[in-house]
Design a protein with these regions (language model features):
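Preference for long, amphipathic alpha-helical scaffolds in soluble/luminal domains
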Residues: 20-22, 28-463
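N-terminal intrinsically disordered, acidic low-complexity segments at the extreme N-terminus
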Residues: 2-29
Length: 463
């Protein structure tokens, strides 16, 4: 006689067996229970083997998914371009703009042009710039000094260590730019590559290094693969990513850090306002770039964009409150921060005049590309622009040279406030057509190949 408990157990076994049959049939596999019955194996053992195989298969599939997610992101060959978005003649008139730009031409023809002057001048003028005087380098010549070791060697001599540093990691070619190592090097990490991106240099552009010709893509890959969210200088790396891969929503660093545009925005906003290069202004410029590109590439969620807008709006409020009656700012532009006011004795290495030119020019530059919703009242940039025009007009030639990197931001800002690139203004005044795209001739044997050692990731500055 079969008990009620035995009957229930038998029904349960039959039910479980039918569920397994259905699941296996749905998966397009043979029923393990029927296979077991045919082969004489216990049903339980076959089911366990099938489940183990399924779990192992899912684990393998998920591992492959994770590995694919961590593959380096692919950039675009052509960079995005940041555009001037307003024309406000009260900030600077046509006549004033012509006068300013004439004084700020890149008159660097001759031996040993400082590389930080060259890369600042390139992003200021663009590769299209041509000038009528013999002492000024054209935009093409400026770019060649940064991307062709032959031109660099001609200017700096064979004994100078090369600016371009080629190497490989496995089968991946790399190019680094020698940085913070004297007048023949760049002054900031990734500044040169960001400048090349801003003037529209494609990643297939040929770079003539001491070790041979390589595409600019090798410099991008080095920046991407060496990047860390804890770098001491990350503003220009952020700009490189924004311009060459704005369509990429997230990626992983080689350290395993997940990077999104929101993560980068928070990184830019988390420091004290005046901290960082040029009293924090390059972080503000990068945020303004993000907002402009967000309109096309949807970098942010609505909430993240609102957070960046609110941050920059607060910055503009502070700038309105701290603007000098004459129209300028200096290193104390943020006013009082969460940990107190800026120190009264704050002064940069080039003195108060340099600080004022730096802070005012940089401020007008990021405002020139920012959306209306973050800008201050109309009179604030007008006063700043008119102060810059008067101050630049009063500088001696020696002071122009001394402050050139600061002034490159001021000149570019003033042109952008008239809705044009500096090279376009020169073309309007001279009647000369902007220079078209030019690429260097094939490489020739070069020196210093053995000296072109690639800096390691450990050499990156940390905060």
């Amino acid at each position: 006689m079969i008990s009620s408990a035995d009957s229930n157990a038998e029904q349960t076994i039959e039910t479980d067996s039918s569920l397994v049959d259905a699941a296996v049939t749905d998966a397009g596999l043979q029923n393990p229970a029927k296979v077991a019955q045919t082969a004489g194996f216990p049903v339980f053992l076959i089911v366990q083997l099938a489940l183990t195989a399924a779990v192992f298969g899912y684990g393998t599939h998920r591992y492959q998914q994770i590995e694919e997610e961590r593959l380096p992101p692919e950039p675009n060959t052509e960079p995005a371009r940041i555009q001037p978005v307003r024309d406000v003649p009260e900030v600077v008139s046509d006549e004033q703009l012509t006068s300013v730009l004439t004084r700020l031409r890149p008159q660097f023809r001759g031996p040993e042009p400082k590389i930080n002057f060259v890369d600042h001048a390139l992003r200021f003028w663009g590769v299209e710039a041509v000038f009528g005087d013999e002492t000024s380098l054209s935009g093409v010549e400026l770019r060649e000094l940064l991307t062709d070791h032959r031109r660099f060697r001609d200017a700096w001599g064979k004994k100078t260590r090369p600016f371009l540093l080629p190497n490989t990691k496995g089968d991946v070619p790399y190019i680094a730019f020698r940085t913070k190592n004297g007048l023949a090097t760049a002054s900031h990490y990734d500044h040169t590559l960001a400048g090349l991106a801003e003037v529209g240099t494609p990643l297939d552009y040929p770079v003539n290094t001491p070790g041979g010709e390589m595409p600019l893509r090798a410099a991008f890959d080095f920046t991407r693969d060496m990047f860390s969210l804890n770098q001491g200088e990350y503003e220009w790396s952020t700009m490189v990513f924004l311009l060459y891969m704005p369509q990429v929503k997230s990626w992983f660093t080689t350290e395993g850090q997940e990077v999104t545009w929101e993560v980068l925005a928070h990184r830019l906003m988390r420091q004290r306002l005046a901290s960082g290069v040029c009293y924090g202004n390059h972080r503000l410029y990068a945020l303004a770039m993000m907002l402009q590109l967000d309109c096309e590439y949807e970098l942010f969620s609505e909430e993240a964009r609102a957070e960046v807008v609110a941050y920059l709006h607060d910055v503009s409020r502070r700038l309105t409150e701290t603007q000098n009656v004459d129209g300028y700012w200096d290193g104390r532009w943020p006013g009082e921060e969460w940990d107190g006011p800026q120190p009264e004795e704050l002064e940069g290495p080039l003195g108060l005049k340099g600080d004022r030119l730096l802070a005012t020019g940089h401020t007008l530059e990021w405002w020139a590309i920012a959306p209306e919703e973050v800008l201050p009242a109309h009179y604030v940039p007008v006063k700043a622009g008119q102060w810059l025009v008067g101050e630049i007009g009063s500088l001696s030639d020696a002071e122009i040279k001394q402050y050139y990197t600061f002034l490159s931001h001021a000149g570019r800002a003033l042109a952008f406030w008239r809705g044009r690139f500096p090279a376009d203004q020169v073309a309007r005044e001279t009647g000369q057509s902007p220079q078209t795209e030019s690429r260097p001739s094939p490489n020739e044997p070069t020196e210093h190949a053995s000296d072109a050692a690639l800096p390691s990731a450990a050499s990156t500055e940390k905060e």
